[in-house]
Curated annotation (Swiss-Prot):
Binding partners and assembly: Homohexamer. Interacts with the tail tube protein.
Record-stated family: Belongs to the Skunalikevirus tail terminator protein family.
Protein name: Probable tail terminator protein
Keywords attached to this entry: Viral release from host cell, Viral tail assembly, Viral tail protein, Virion
Gene Ontology terms describing biological process: viral tail assembly
Source organism of the structure: Lactococcus phage SK1 (Lactococcus lactis bacteriophage SK1)
C-alpha cells in the first residue's frame, strides 16, 4: 500500500514566502500612492483679507521614491529611509501627524488585512 506523503513543512514555507512577497508589494504600492496624494495636499491660510495656499509637507513627494522593500529573514519590511534621504530637514513621513495621514494609515492597514484574506495563490 503506497501512501502519498506530502511534505507539508516545505509547502507551508513556500506559501508563507509567496504571501509575504505579495503583501510587501501591495503595501509598498499603497503607501506610495498615499504619499503622493499627501504631497499634493495643500493648506489654506486666510490672512489680511487674502487666502494663501501652500503645501505643508513638500518633501512627502520624495517619500514615494524613498519607499523600498527590505528583506529581513523571513519578513519583508517597507522602509521609508532616514532623514538623510530627504532634501529638507525632516522625514517624509511627517504627514502622518495630521488627521488625514493617520486615517490613511488606518484604512491601508484595514485594506491590507482584507487583501490578505481574499488573496488567491
Amino acid at each position: 500500500m503506497a501512501m502519498n506523503l506530502l511534505n507539508t513543512a516545505s509547502i507551508a514555507k513556500e506559501m508563507q514566502t509567496k504571501v509575504t512577497e505579495r503583501m510587501g508589494d501591495w503595501f509598498e504600492a499603497e503607501f506610495k500612492a498615499k504619499a503622493n496624494s499627501a504631497s499634493r495636499r495643500t493648506r489654506l491660510i486666510r490672512s489680511h483679507g487674502h487666502t494663501y495656499t501652500y503645501a505643508r509637507y513638500q518633501n512627502t513627494g520624495q517619500l514615494s521614491s524613498n519607499l523600498k522593500q527590505v528583506k529581513k529573514g523571513d519578513k519583508i519590511v517597507v522602509n521609508a529611509g532616514t532623514r538623510a534621504n530627504y532634501t529638507s530637514g525632516y522625514h517624509g513621513m511627517y504627514f502622518l501627524v495630521e488627521k488625514k495621514g493617520m486615517q490613511d494609515v488606518k484604512t491601508t492597514l484595514k485594506k491590507g488585512a482584507n487583501y490578505a484574506n481574499s488573496m488567491k495563490l
